[in-house]
Design a protein with these regions (language model features):
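Basic/Trp-rich segment in TM-proximal cytosolic loops or flexible interdomain/linker regions
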Residues: 1-13, 32-43, 65-78, 238, ...
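Short, acidic, metal-binding catalytic loop of nucleotide-sugar glycosyltransferases
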Residues: 103-117
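Long helical/loop segments within the catalytic core of UDP-sugar-dependent glycosyltransferases
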Residues: 144-167, 179-266, 277-278, 299-338
Length: 528
């Protein structure tokens, strides 16, 4: 085991060294300084994108080297002398009673020494009579309000004013907690000092949109597993654990000191966790599944969800001024800045999809160097980085799948993130529908498909022109553009396949079967 860790450490260090060498080489030996202003400007843009990607790579690898990715050990529940009361908030706005019934039943089935001390509240921002009747039928509490000010955060803050237990668990309407959720989370508040919240991962009873559309159910992990089981766990070291809006247990005092759930951004959850941690409280992330929810099953809802997350993080940056906020250490600030910078990947990916076409189609040189020298420096760096990422993350995320996810999402996020950053603020909070049945291609899906098709055709043209020009020129002049364009064609082809498999499914057609190494629940499609 020690040799395995040492090997991973060596790979990380070597990758970092080679990346530094490559960037230095790119800056001083590859810019087309004598080929005109246009070539130089475009070359600098591409170089800056490479440096930006390398900084993200550095941040990630350093976190891996300096942190322990093991989940904190769960303390024994018997350390608690007096069993406290716990309020359970289930947030809802327009979700169906069927979805809520499943979550309420799971909350009522949570194990606890004294179940009379579990107080379940359905926090209905839709103020619906049918939901009120459901809570009466299921013998749980109902809280509503006449307006939707501050959306989900306002909903929770309204519930805070009407409850008084020292601990508060929060769940989305579709997130059915595991039986041992409270027995897993509560002991941390007694075994450690100043714990503000404990965050557990989520899993799903149906395949995510990538697994389903690409026919990879149980062959690849849930897209969010990488975040919950790798990135979040590493954040324990720097006390920068992200509150994800559901599957968490808070101390009421920490929320009181943070002035309740954060408002004014579309990502009230991340902002709330950050403010709680800035007040001196600790956030703890565990590797143990805390609830099973329902994955978004249509692209329009998925796109709105990711857009809300992206724009919300940028709004958080602007409102709370992460780099100057009081109470956070430098490393905490950098960790939260990485949450923001991540969402700009669409801009970077779009530049990579277009960059090789500058030379293959328009003949604009953006890398001016000896090809053999370039390959001898770039290839080992590229291979080692990919190998390093793959061996570190194992089956959670591969570099290939990471590029597939980014290519699919680029048309969705690229310009919206840029618009939010320069000041076009989105204020409406779109609740994500979790189960829809529609067998026609949505408008958003068509828009994204048109983007992917356009980029695919451009790269095909570039690829053909590379081949054609080889007959008139030395192959060395085109091999870099040739390989780069071929790579883009592969990722864009997968994206088009994703776009074309647009038929949605009903999550009820998926039922739990057995534990498996990826999704924790193997899922079988019921034959109708």
């Amino acid at each position: 085991m020690k040799l395995k860790k040492l090997f991973k450490f060596a790979i990380c260090i070597l990758s970092l060294i080679l990346t530094i060498i490559y960037i230095i080489y790119r800056i001083f030996y590859t810019l087309p300084t004598s080929l005109g202003a246009l070539s130089l400007i475009l070359a600098i843009i591409i170089l800056l994108v490479e440096i930006w990607e390398s900084i993200d790579f550095f941040t990630y690898f350093i976190n891996i080297l300096l942190t322990n990715k093991k989940s904190p050990k769960i303390p024994n529940f018997n350390i608690i002398n007096e069993i406290p009361d716990i309020d359970v908030f289930i947030a809802t706005y327009n979700e169906s009673p069927n979805i809520l019934t499943r979550t309420i039943e799971a909350c009522k089935n949570m194990e606890y020494p004294d179940k009379n001390k579990i107080h379940i509240y359905v926090c209905d921002d839709g103020d619906r009579l049918e939901i009120k009747n459901l809570t009466i039928k299921m013998d749980v509490n109902y809280i509503s309000r006449s307006n939707r000010k501050d959306a989900k955060a306002g909903n929770y803050n309204n519930a805070l004013l009407k409850t008084n237990s020292p601990y508060i668990a929060t769940f989305d309407s579709d997130m059915a907690p595991t039986k041992d959720f409270l027995l897993t989370t509560l002991p941390f508040f007694y075994s450690e000092k100043n714990v503000g919240f404990v965050q557990l991962p989520q899993s799903f009873i149906n395949p995510d949109i990538f697994q389903y559309r690409l026919k990879m159910q149980n062959k690849i992990p849930f897209e969010q597993d990488y975040f919950y089981h790798s990135i979040q766990i590493a954040k324990n070291k720097t006390n920068s654990v992200v509150y994800c809006g559901t599957n968490a247990l808070f101390s009421r005092q920490s929320l009181k000191d943070a002035n309740g759930f954060a408002t004014g951004t579309l990502s009230e959850d991340i902002a709330t966790g950050m403010i709680v941690e800035s007040k001196g409280y600790k956030g703890i992330a565990l590797n143990k599944i805390g609830a099973y929810g329902i994955c978004v099953n249509d692209f329009s809802a998925f796109a709105k969800q990711r857009t809300r997350w992206a724009r919300g993080c940028i709004q958080m940056l602007k409102k709370y001024k992460i780099l100057t906020i009081k109470g956070l250490s430098v490393r905490q600030k950098l960790e939260y800045m990485s949450c923001v910078s991540y969402w700009f990947f669409g801009i970077r990916r779009l530049i990579y999809l277009l960059a090789p076409l500058l030379f293959s189609i328009f003949g604009i040189i953006v890398v001016d160097c000896n090809l053999l020298t370039f390959i001898s420096i770039w290839l080992p760096t590229y291979v080692l980085k990919r190998f390093g990422l793959d061996i570190i993350e194992g089956n959670k995320r591969s570099s290939t799948w990471n590029k597939i996810y980014e290519t699919i999402l680029t048309p969705v996020l690229c310009f919206k993130v840029l618009a939010e950053f320069i000041g076009f603020k989105q204020t409406n909070f779109n609740v994500t529908p979790k189960n829809t049945s529609n067998y026609t291609m949505e408008k958003e899906n068509k828009k994204v498909l048109s983007w992917h098709l356009s980029l695919f055709i451009l790269n095909i043209i570039g690829f053909i022109m590379c081949i054609a020009r080889v007959y008139d020129n030395s192959i060395e002049n085109y091999i870099l553009s040739f390989v780069w364009t071929f790579s883009n064609i592969f990722y864009l082809f997968i994206s088009i396949v994703f776009d074309l498999r647009y038929k949605r499914y009903d999550y009820k057609n998926f039922v739990p079967n057995k534990i498996n190494k990826y999704s924790k629940l193997a899922l079988i499609r019921r034959e109708k």
